[in-house]
Amino acid sequence: MVVVAVSGQPGSGKTTIAREIARVLKVPLVSSGTLFREMATKMGIDFLEFHKYAESNPEIDKSVDTAAVERAKAGNVVLEGHLTAWVVRPYADVCIYLKASPEVRARRVALRDGKSLEEAYREVTEREELNRRRYLAIYGIDIKDLSIFDLVVDTSFLSVNDAVRISVDFTCTTLSFKYSKKVC
């Protein structure tokens, strides 16, 4: 019953890494960010504005996190999201945190979302601060405390392939030792 949690900063490569780990392990990927985006779209609210809205409506985060915990308890899943690893740590075999400089993350988000570099920079830094405040208020979790993670990867100067290789190799090695058999 393999459970891998991938968390990190906006634009750090969480979804890319989590998707590849899920592919290698042949398990589903559950993305908290996708669920959060879907909720914003249903309410007709801009994604960044929805983050602000969620700050005064903790039930939004709690519903997303409850879904993540339920999937983790069921096992055989890769979970991805900003807070995911902290929430599912008791059930996770491996927790990975991805980070990158604000400039690099802004460049990635600008390319991914078709935004200006300035707009993307504002978004990644503002989202990170909104997330930090929200998670501290709702759960008492400081997302700057990375002590729960088995692996922390700075993706600033890594190619996508290198970041994936490091994360997948670590995950496969850890799971093979934990379960005393080749997992990947």
Curated annotation (Swiss-Prot):
InterPro entries attached to this UniProt entry: Cyt_kin_arch, Cytidylate_kinase_dom, P-loop_NTPase
EC class name: transferase
MF-aspect GO terms: ATP binding; CMP kinase activity; dCMP kinase activity
Principal subcellular localisation of the protein: cytoplasm
Location in the cell: Cytoplasm
Binding-site positions, ATP: 8-16
GO biological process, one term: pyrimidine nucleotide metabolic process
GO-annotated cellular components: cytoplasm
Keywords of this entry: ATP-binding, Cytoplasm, Kinase, Nucleotide-binding, Transferase
Catalytic activity, reaction form: CMP + ATP = CDP + ADP; dCMP + ATP = dCDP + ADP
EC number: 2.7.4.25
Xref: CDD domains: CMPK
Source organism superkingdom: Archaea
Family, similarity comment: Belongs to the cytidylate kinase family. Type 2 subfamily.
Name of the molecule in the record: Cytidylate kinase
Organism taxonomic ancestry: Archaea, Thermoproteota, Thermoprotei, Thermoproteales, Thermoproteaceae
Gene: cmk
